[in-house]
Regions:
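Short amphipathic alpha-helix that is part of the acyltransferase structural core
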Residues: 1-29
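Conserved acetyl-CoA binding element of GNAT-fold acetyltransferases
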Residues: 56-69, 95
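Glycine-centered recognition micro-motifs in short, flexible terminal segments and loops
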Residues: 67-78
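Conserved GNAT acetyl-CoA-binding A-motif
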Residues: 85-96
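Conserved active-site alpha-helix within GNAT-family acetyltransferase domains
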Residues: 99-116
Length: 146
């Protein structure tokens, strides 16, 4: 009988430094912020999604997000639980390139609104959208218990 090959499971990763490295490869110019908290998702030992939360002020926390592969429910739950259950903020905010239609669509599916457009603010001269997910607008069922 042949043994099954070993597989590396998908898993959450909380190494903020490694998550910043993943994000910087996708968000040129991203700077580290002291006290930031990272949540990543590895598949087969490779980071495929990551978020870093920073500038928590009691009401809002900002996130930098990059996603290379379809999201797992477990990563999404951790991503949403951190700001709303752990930090207990009213709003999660992030800057999204206007050209990143995939991330903007995901934000809208979760209940986020596009609060502002920063014309010409992107490195390439494109626009940047400020997306805000208010606790009361959250459409994802993973926080039903909160």
């Amino acid at each position: 009988m042949r043994a099954k090959p070993a597989t590396v499971a998908s898993m959450l990763d909380y190494d903020t430094s490694a998550i910043y490295t993943f994000l910087r490869m996708r968000i040129p110019g991203l700077l580290s912020t002291e006290g930031a908290v990272g949540i990543g998702w590895k598949r087969g030992g490779v980071m495929v999604a990551g978020a870093v939360f920073e500038q928590h002020n009691g009401r809002t926390v900002w996130a930098h997000v990059a996603i290379d592969a379809p999201l797992s429910r477990r990563f999404l739950r951790a991503f949403l639980d951190y700001p709303f259950a752990v930090c207990a903020v009213d709003a999660l905010r992030g800057y999204v390139l206007a050209s990143n239609t995939r991330l903007r669509a995901l934000a809208r599916r979760l209940g986020a609104v596009e609060e502002a457009v920063l014309a010409g603010a992107a490195r390439d001269g494109g626009d940047v959208v400020v997306c805000t997910l208010w606790r009361g607008n959250l459409k994802h069922d993973t926080l039903a218990q909160h």
